[in-house]
């Protein structure tokens, strides 16, 4: 019974990885009722300078949030009216680099009607399960965020490591060439030339 109740109380969360080509824009839509809490968490995982333009618009085409060249972010708001909300990621500023963006759209519970709010007591177990569900969702999002950050930093470390190895090989070749050059020069310096 508790598991069924927990599954019913969990807020919906949609997590995605999306590839956005250069000069392109990708939009996602969520239909909610007025007063519903919504959140967007995003992170640019790969591509260029790891930046993306983000825009959230309401059903009335009113801008709720706009961010330019952001690499990650968290934004939470309450729906101001019933309708479809639009979440857009734009890579129009990039000339040739596609970006891979990880994002999660959290949709909270719809606000309860007046008749439910006037009840004398709310079930304590239901409240605790709801709090636990919210905490579990937050932990899941943080873990996904850390996985993306780890992937980014691993790529940077691998790139740096390969450059250091290549530079070391180059330095070794230069050292060998200089050694051979000095040996040749010193041999010629101490050679006795005979004039016949």
Swiss-Prot record:
Region feature Required for TMED10 and TMED2 cis-Golgi network localization, mapped onto this chain: 113-152
InterPro entries per UniProt: Emp24-like, GOLD_dom, GOLD_dom_sf
Keywords: Coiled coil, Cytoplasmic vesicle, Endoplasmic reticulum, ER-Golgi transport, Golgi apparatus, Membrane, Protein transport, Signal, Transmembrane, Transmembrane helix, Transport
Signal peptide interval: 1-15
Residue stretches making up the GOLD domain: 25-107
Gene Ontology CC entries for this record: COPI-coated vesicle; COPI-coated vesicle membrane; endoplasmic reticulum; endoplasmic reticulum membrane; endoplasmic reticulum-Golgi intermediate compartment; endoplasmic reticulum-Golgi intermediate compartment membrane; Golgi apparatus; Golgi cisterna membrane
Ranges per topology, Lumenal: 16-163
Residue numbers covered by motif COPII vesicle coat-binding: 189-190
Coiled coil spans: 112-162
PANTHER family for the chain: TRANSMEMBRANE EMP24 DOMAIN-CONTAINING PROTEIN
Function comment: Involved in vesicular protein trafficking. Mainly functions in the early secretory pathway but also in post-Golgi membranes. Thought to act as cargo receptor at the lumenal side for incorporation of secretory cargo molecules into transport vesicles and to be involved in vesicle coat formation at the cytoplasmic side.
Descriptive protein name: Transmembrane emp24 domain-containing protein 2
């Amino acid at each position: 019974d508790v598991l069924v109740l927990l599954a019913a109380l969990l807020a919906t969360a949609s997590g995605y990885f999306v590839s956005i080509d250069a000069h392109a824009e990708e939009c996602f839509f969520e239909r909610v009722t007025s007063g519903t809490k919504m959140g967007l968490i995003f992170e640019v995982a790969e591509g260029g300078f790891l930046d993306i333009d983000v825009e959230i618009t309401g059903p009335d085409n009113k801008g709720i949030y706009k961010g330019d060249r952001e690499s990650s972010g968290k934004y939470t708001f309450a729906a101001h009216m019933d309708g479809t909300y639009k979440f857009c990621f734009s890579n129009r500023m990039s000339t040739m680099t596609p970006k891979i963006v990880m994002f999660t759209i959290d949709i909270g519970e719809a606000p309860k009607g007046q008749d439910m709010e006037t009840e004398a007591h709310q079930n304590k177990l239901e409240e605790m399960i709801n709090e636990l569900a919210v905490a579990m969702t937050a932990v899941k999002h943080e873990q996904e965020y850390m996985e993306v950050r780890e992937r980014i930093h691993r790529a940077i470390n691998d790139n740096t490591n390969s450059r250091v190895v290549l530079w070391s090989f180059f330095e070794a070749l230069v050292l060998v060439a200089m050694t051979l050059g000095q040996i040749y020069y010193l041999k010629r310096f101490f050679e006795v030339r005979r004039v016949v």
